[in-house]
């Protein structure tokens, strides 16, 4: 069997430098050169997965087709690679220890003392190898920063794995910061030198260094980094701040990043076709038109919480040659503001998902304003649930209508806890209010049957069903379906009795979906729900 080649990506100096974007950009170039490529993110934190972590703590939780709750970098990987990944493409320290302890309890280690080396490191290596099966190249991003104590087993694993697979089958890329000191008026390389020194003390010598900076590096500075860090001169690549993350693969290509990669990994004919990508990026950066959308959410102070959704909107803008300006609206603050003043200058209102009661009434106000004023509206996940609550209160006149998530004793729970459903493997899942939170939601891609001649059918080009990804614990209560439909709120999508989408039949564009369309949107293949909403907003502005 052909040996998979590995590219290990580490980061130094500080976090949030963009290792995920760099890894995804290299993967894009390799894939467009005709290679079978995949990416894995190894996260050193102790949580089993990010599913129960606060958006303020971790940012978005990205969900794969098979229902894995993963790091937001997997979203970048999918959007750049234009491929669906799985739970094999992300694991944490918590997951590794959980697996090793379970094996120990089953007696699989035959009574041996369980240690970080070889058992924990061995488990990490096994997971990396599994993710690379059947691929020409596996890119492995190690989360965190070199020097973090929790990352040591992961660095030991990639050090050992490189020795195991041999020369020309693995390489190390290190991403560092080259800060610009305004007072001195120059870029400083010392943090990079120290970071590489720290990496070497662990036993890893980088083959390539990618330098994050707000300004371009001149040739002398690159040569200085190459000499002091022991890499070839053509292996010092700059990653300067860009107008769009989708420029990064093109910027890397201009610096001929593939030549040293090809030489180190013994690869031939790396000539990526990036024409379509380049065309779309130009429309992202310099579109012909512009439209403004209100983005209503409770985590608007941390935009990373909605990463996939904001990227999907960029994809739609590129497809429609339009810059989509987002007006961020804090749903909690909206509760005490005048809707007409907040939404007077927008051509569409998007109500995003979320958890917990804070900011809910503000979202309901936004939905009511969109419905009554015929402004294009899209509700996602909680946005759909609250569209039902708003309609029940203001049209059906059920003033105490609510979700049982926010009021367990309400008399009209138009949204309630899903107590029984079939998971993505076809197995029955039973839930109660006391079920532990971790990994117990309705997660992953489920088939949605679409009502003929509906707005949703038009959005999806008249197909009978689609598969979209979910992440929710509560669901529309079918007990109220007849009343909703009698008054014009139509169920246009469902999945084995669960309501997946609703729409208003007397509104230019009022669509709410239980699933997350943003999780399947890519630059080269935008999700139809997001694209149709932006198109409706453009039409609203034109008219």
UniProtKB/Swiss-Prot annotation:
Residues that coordinate or bind Mg(2+): 73, 141
The protein's enzyme class: ligase
UniProt GO molecular function: ATP binding; CTP synthase activity; glutaminase activity; identical protein binding; metal ion binding
Keyword Magnesium carried by entry: yes
Domain of life: Bacteria
Catalysed reactions, as listed in the record: UTP + L-glutamine + ATP + H2O = CTP + L-glutamate + ADP + phosphate + 2 H(+); L-glutamine + H2O = L-glutamate + NH4(+); UTP + NH4(+) + ATP = CTP + ADP + phosphate + 2 H(+)
TM segment ranges: none
Activity modulation notes: Allosterically activated by GTP, when glutamine is the substrate; GTP has no effect on the reaction when ammonia is the substrate. The allosteric effector GTP functions by stabilizing the protein conformation that binds the tetrahedral intermediate(s) formed during glutamine hydrolysis. Inhibited by the product CTP, via allosteric rather than competitive inhibition.
One Pfam family from the record: GATase
Residues annotated as signal peptide: none
The protein's Enzyme Commission number: 6.3.4.2
Misc. comment: CTPSs have evolved a hybrid strategy for distinguishing between UTP and CTP. The overlapping regions of the product feedback inhibitory and substrate sites recognize a common feature in both compounds, the triphosphate moiety. To differentiate isosteric substrate and product pyrimidine rings, an additional pocket far from the expected kinase/ligase catalytic site, specifically recognizes the cytosine and ribose portions of the product inhibitor.
Protein name as annotated: CTP synthase
Organism encoding this protein: Campylobacter jejuni (strain RM1221)
Source organism phylogeny: Bacteria, Pseudomonadati, Campylobacterota, Epsilonproteobacteria, Campylobacterales
